[in-house]
Amino acid sequence: MTTNNLVLAGTITRSRQFDSPAGIAHTVVMLEHKSQRYEAGMLRNVYCQIQVVLSGERFNGVAKNLTAGVEIQVEGFINLQQSRNGQNRLVLHAENVELKT
């Protein structure tokens, strides 16, 4: 197995919850990250948005708190997801979520 682990903190910009046809609870949030990092000795602004998917009963307790404006830190793995129109995007599948606010 190869390493696939990402830790990212940011602010939720939108959130939705639904159950799959198999009855699995899912919460999907858009996470916006802003920071500054040094690269090659220069300080640069860093910005990204990524969709985060929380699946299963273990997230039921925290899912109700995941609304726009809430700051979280997520640890999980990234996976390629293809939309209905054929667009590819990276999605972060959460394995651990921590509320920061």
UniProtKB/Swiss-Prot annotation:
Pfam families: SSB_1 (PF22657). One of its GO terms (biological process) is DNA replication, synthesis of primer. Gene3D superfamilies: Nucleic acid-binding proteins (2.40.50.140). SUPFAM superfamilies: Nucleic acid-binding proteins. The keyword DNA-binding applies. Residues 1-101 form the SSB domain. InterPro entries: NA-bd_OB-fold (IPR012340), Primosome_PriB/ssb (IPR000424), Prisomal_replication_PriB (IPR023646). Keywords: DNA replication, DNA-binding, Primosome. GO terms for molecular function: single-stranded DNA binding. GO terms for cellular component: primosome complex. NCBIfam families: PriB_gamma. Belongs to the PriB family. Involved in the restart of stalled replication forks, which reloads the replicative helicase on sites other than the origin of replication; the PriA-PriB pathway is the major replication restart pathway. During primosome assembly it facilitates complex formation between PriA and DnaT on DNA; stabilizes PriA on DNA. Stimulates the DNA unwinding activity of PriA helicase. Homodimer. Interacts with PriA and DnaT. Component of the replication restart primosome. Primosome assembly occurs via a 'hand-off' mechanism. PriA binds to replication forks, subsequently PriB then DnaT bind; DnaT then displaces ssDNA to generate the helicase loading substrate. This is Replication restart protein PriB. It comes from Shewanella pealeana (strain ATCC 700345 / ANG-SQ1).
